[in-house]
Amino acid sequence: MKSELTVPLARLVPWQTPAQCEPPEALLPWLLEADSMTRRLRRHNRHFSVQLFGNRSVALDADEQQLVVAEQPMGLCREVILHGDHGPAVLGWTLFAEAALQESGLRELGEQPLGERIFGDEPARRDHLQLACFEIASNPWCPAGTVWGRRSRLFLGQWPLLVHELFLPSLSCNKELE
């Protein structure tokens, strides 16, 4: 978890494989989704948008540095909220090595969903799927509460990206979860 995130939160348990934890049953299809979260949200919502908070330099933890193959302990973080019919649904942040920004086209991404780029024409490569539970503080996008999230490594061409997705309370308004 990066303390520099716009939405204040604290991880309650270490990242674990799906077999090591017990998230709410209704969230399992979301947490274990193999395809793009953007596609899943678009399938279940008439309205979808991306709110970009920005890109910034951040200190990478040792495991993050290893997963994104960063030569230095600093990396870049792209932070967004994905909105659906009932408001903010997913808080996302992606960590990557600075070299990836220069050579992968991430700089020009803007408010285009990262999932559209990664899951474009070719099958995406994903590994290191892990889940964790977070305490999220009250903020302009959601009330305080406990939320579940996932992180996994995806590849944009040759560049590894560590993608984090936290499922916000308004996602439970989605008809699939009822």
Swiss-Prot record:
Substrate binds at M37, R78, L114, E165. It comes from Aeromonas hydrophila subsp. hydrophila (strain ATCC 7966 / DSM 30187 / BCRC 13018 / CCUG 14551 / JCM 1027 / KCTC 2358 / NCIMB 9240 / NCTC 8049). Keywords: Cytoplasm, Lyase, Pyruvate, Ubiquinone biosynthesis. It is an enzyme of class 4 (lyase). It catalyses: chorismate = 4-hydroxybenzoate + pyruvate. One of its GO terms (cellular component) is cytosol. Pfam families: Chor_lyase. Belongs to the UbiC family. It is found in: Cytoplasm. This is Probable chorismate pyruvate-lyase. The keyword Glycosyltransferase does not apply. Transmembrane segments: none annotated. Pathway: Cofactor biosynthesis; ubiquinone biosynthesis. InterPro entries: Chorismate--pyruvate_lyase, Chorismate_lyase_/UTRA_dom_sf. Coiled coil: none annotated. Removes the pyruvyl group from chorismate, with concomitant aromatization of the ring, to provide 4-hydroxybenzoate (4HB) for the ubiquinone pathway. Disulfide bonds: none annotated. Its EC number is 4.1.3.40. GO terms for biological process: pyruvate biosynthetic process; ubiquinone biosynthetic process. GO terms for molecular function: chorismate lyase activity.
